[in-house]
Swiss-Prot record:
Protein name: Chaperone protein DnaK
Disulfide bonds: none
Record-linked CDD domains: ASKHA_NBD_HSP70_DnaK-like (cd10234)
Organism: Francisella tularensis
SUPFAM superfamilies assigned to the protein according to its UniProt record, in alphabetical order: Actin-like ATPase domain, Heat shock protein 70kD (HSP70), C-terminal subdomain, Heat shock protein 70kD (HSP70), peptide-binding domain
Biased composition (Acidic residues): 628-642
């Protein structure tokens, strides 16, 4: 059985970890970084870039570079959040899919579901794990914000499937962080508050870590959060400030210039990071735009105090869910023994200060906020694989679940913060005499009014025998699995007739959609490999042309005019081949040049050996090695290519 990898699929960055023996280890990506930007770009040449490569070219390709896609996953286009919070904040097109979901589109008009885009990030994680382990990887534990609803969890599983991964478990991010902390912690019973402020979402979970018969039991007592509060909002606040200041100075509004906007966005993110250790920073963007008077440069000094004033309301917004989580757990602030900070945004001094003020204790600094979640996911993978045996994890459902009953009321079957997996049943009846069918409308949320909650789906239980209203007994059962995904059934107790569905969002992706996206992803993987191989062949050819011409020049009169002409002709033919897309033609012309150059090289080395006199025997070995000079040059090009 292969490894079950742990993936923190973040809004801004993602992280990968595996179990290495008894400990979880974060794996570096191909670029040597421990986190990967959750950015996917589609280039004009048809190449798909993921991670740092995609982020680097965002300024010149804003329409086709997709970031913060996690904020769209599992959401409807008409959601207030999508219309007000997301569409206005991203340079790429957010469109309405046929099923009502929020999708994205490239400038060429290619439409994609958010899980399809997220799958590209997961594919990179999968490839990184396979390169490290030297074996195929097919299973993963993927984390989601604790406050993700059923649709968002299902969409995350879909993304895994499209990427070629069987998602063995969806685990809440704060729970994963507590797992990472709890497994290393041997300090007896603790009540831990996990404050998780990431790139796009905020979660707070109150978690009890205790020793039960030698096992580390990690039980989530309550969770709360805000799926529209994160580091991206901090970036945006600073970006808008910079744009407003520039407008005051120059009278030009950069909001309508996508290229300039992307540059300011990146500068704002960089300045935000710099203002954690430093008291002030300069944002300097030369040639940001131009008007009739010439080019304009943006140069603005930002102090930490100014930045804090811009985002203080965002930090304060995170404290209300903290209060609710404590109330739901039935605890006071003094009951909390440890506070863990998770998510890159918690590096901000103001965040640390406000969290300390709220809980009345210093947050722990020994947990890596970027990596703890992935480490926890890997540990959960180890538990599922049977490699980690002394850990028991008890998570909760973040939102109440129920059905719509007479008068448009939501009747809750499972209250929020119920430990999962769980199963609850309740008997309902008909509202009319001789009612032949009932519609079960499944809801998620905390409001009394059914229409104010999230609709997860509907299904009908038909063929109810005629009877006066209130007589038939319809048993509705809600069953939540360990991933927090819901299965609902309705049964007529008189006839035994039953109807059930696994709840997806009322839109969501069908199995056919997912299968098509899996095939697209596999086709892209093949196309990506072909593109990579073509680039490698071109680089090899370019390098050989360069080294051949250089050698001819250095050998001078030792090479005849006919030989020079033959080499030059072979170089020109190879150059022509590299301008095309035929890898085999490039390789054939490369071989032809190597063969043309080989006799000249041998003759030159033989002359060198003769000149060496008595040391000829020793020197003769070196020319043999020198025959591999082309290979050594190839490796230099490989480095460049990376």
């Amino acid at each position: 059985m292969g490894k079950i990898i742990g993936i923190d699929l973040g809004t801004t960055n993602s992280c990968l970890a595996i179990m290495d023996g008894k400990t979880a280890k974060v794996i570096e990506n191909a670029e040597g970084h421990r986190t990967t930007p959750s950015v996917v770009a589609y280039t004009d040449s048809g190449e798909i870039l993921v991670g740092q490569a995609a982020k680097r070219q965002a300024v010149t390709n804003p329409d086709n570079t997709f970031f913060a896609i996690k904020r769209l996953i599992g959401r409807k286009y008409d959601d207030k959040a999508v219309q007000e919070d997301i569409k206005k904040k991203v340079p790429y097109a957010v469109i309405k899919a046929d099923n009502g979901d929020a999708w994205v589109a490239t400038k060429e008009g290619k439409k994609m579901a958010p899980p399809q885009v997220s799958a590209e990030v997961l594919r990179k994680m999968k490839k990184t794990a396979e390169d490290y382990l030297g074996e195929p990887v097919t299973e993963a534990v993927i984390t989601v914000p604790a406050y993700f609803n059923d649709s968002q969890r299902q969409a995350t599983k879909d993304a895994g499937k499209i990427a070629g991964l069987e998602v063995k478990r969806i685990i809440n991010e704060p729970t994963a962080a507590a797992l990472a902390y709890g497994v290393d912690s041997k300090k007896g019973e603790q009540t831990v508050a996990v404050y998780d402020l990431g790139g796009g979402t905020f979660d707070i979970s109150i978690i009890e870590i205790s020793d039960v018969d030698g096992d580390n039991q990690i039980e989530v007592l309550s969770t709360n959060g805000d799926t529209f509060l994160g580091g991206e909002d901090f970036d945006l606040a600073l970006m808008n400030y910079l744009i407003d200041e520039f407008k005051k100075e120059q009278g030009i509004d950069l909001h309508n210039d996508k290229l300039a906007l992307q540059r300011v966005r990146e500068a704002a993110e960089k300045a935000k990071v710099e203002l954690s250790p430093a008291q002030q920073t300069d944002v300097n963007l030369p040639y940001i735009t131009a008007d009739a008077t010439g080019p304009k440069h943006l140069n603005i000094k930002v102090t930490r105090a100014k930045f804090e004033s811009l985002v203080s309301d965002l930090v304060m917004r995170s404290l209300e869910p903290c209060k609710k989580a404590l109330e739901d757990a039935g605890l006071s602030k003094s009951d909390i023994t440890e506070v863990l900070l998770v998510g890159g945004q918690t590096r901000m001094p103001l965040v640390q200060e406000k969290v300390k003020e709220f809980f009345g204790k210093e947050p722990r600094k020994d947990v890596n906020p970027d990596e703890a979640v992935a480490v926890g996911a890997a540990i959960q993978g180890g538990v599922l694989a049977g490699d980690v045996k002394d850990v028991l994890l008890l998570d909760v459902t973040p939102l109440s679940l129920g059905i719509e009953t007479m008068g448009g009321v939501m009747t809750k079957l499972i209250e929020r913060n119920t430990t999962i997996p769980t199963k609850k049943s309740q008997v309902f009846s008909t509202a009319e005499d001789n009612q032949p069918a009932v519609t079960i409308h499944v809801l998620q949320g905390e409001r009394e009014m059914a229409s104010a909650n999230k609709s997860l789906g509907r299904f009908d239980l038909a063929d109810i025998p005629p009877a006066p209203r209130g007589m038939p007994q319809i048993e509705v059962t809600f069953d939540i699995d360990a991933n927090g995904i819901l299965n609902v059934s309705a049964k007529d107790k008189a006839t035994g007739k039953e109807q059930n569905i696994v709840i997806k969002s009322s839109s969501g992706l069908s199995e056919e959609d997912i299968e098509k996206m899996v095939q697209d992803a596999e086709a892209n993987a093949e196309a990506d490999k072909k593109f990579h191989d073509l680039v490698t062949a071109r680089n090899t050819a370019d390098n050989l042309i360069h080294s051949s011409r250089k050698a001819i020049q250095e050998l001078g009169d030792k090479v005849t005019a006919a030989e020079k002409e033959k080499i030059e002709e072979a170089c020109k033919e190879l150059e022509a081949a590299t301008k095309g897309d035929d890898k085999q033609a490039i390789e054939a012309k490369t071989k032809a040049l190597e063969e043309a150059f080989a006799p000249i090289a041998q003759k030159a080395y033989a002359e060198q050996a003769q000149a060496a006199g008595a040391q000829g025997g020793a020197k003769a070995e070196e020319p043999k090695k020198e025959e591999d000079v082309v290979d050594a040059d190839f490796e230099d090009v490989e480095d460049d290519k990376k």
